[in-house]
Amino acid sequence: MTKDRFGFFLVTGGSRGIGAACALRAARDWPVAIFYRERTEEAHQVVRTIECAGGTAVAIQADVGDEDSLMRGFEALDKVGPLAVLVNNAGVTGGVSRVDTLSASALQEVYRVNVIGAFLAAREAVRRMSTQHSGQGGAIVNISSGASVLGSPNNWVHYAASKGAIDTMTIGLSKEVAAEGIRVNAVRPGLIDTELQRGRSAEQLQKMISVVPLGRMGTVEEIAEAVVWLASPAAGYVTGCLLDARGGL
């Protein structure tokens, strides 16, 4: 692990998928913390994998959409070390639904986690990293979605709209904290080979892949590389960026 990176690289929803891939990739350069809600064994397996490779990692139970739970998570992290990077990855889709069959409870859960959770985590990150709060600066990388651009009709417009909120937050917050040593960017993944997509039929997947110019699904490792680059000093002049990783779609 490189020793010149100050502070922890925190990934919310870091127990699987894109979040786990971000944690594993970041561990080459930073000590890593992951917040998880329910998947205890998966979260600790990520930690073990990092430690076996010579890195430093900690898993902390925290529900980002529950302010009290999230605050306890950040307080636990404070005892371990300072924060350098926040990756706002935790999210839910709310299930496939047209708007005319969407339940209020599904909509509320999507916005509780995807929007409120991301804002609360960003708030706590700014409080710790901002030079106005005696911090040393840092980076926030939000995991948005290509759905925010495409809208996901007949699938999950509600989820797409929540990611549209993340895009707007990324742009606004990047300007708000630019003079305080914090860069804020987002990655917008497209069709990625995750547990979510593996639940689809082969016919469904092929239909989705057929419209991707690169002709395949992306990998979680490819998304992690984009996230780590945005968080790193190599992207030191990049802020307010919405980086599309959608295979050309």
Per-region residue spans from a language model:
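Short, small/polar-rich loop/turn modules that mediate ligand/substrate recognition or access, typified
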Residues: 178, 183, 238-240
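Alpha-helical segment proximal to the catalytic Tyr-Lys
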Residues: 127, 175-176, 236
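Conserved glycine-rich cofactor-binding loop
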Residues: 15-16
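Residue(s) in the substrate-gating loop at a strand-loop-helix junction
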Residues: 145
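C-terminal substrate-recognition "lid" of short-chain dehydrogenase/reductases
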Residues: 216-245
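Active-site helix of classical SDR
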Residues: 122, 162
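Catalytic Tyr-X3-Lys loop
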Residues: 100-119, 141, 166, 214
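Substrate-binding pocket helix/loop in short-chain dehydrogenase/reductase
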Residues: 97-99, 103-111, 197, 204, ...
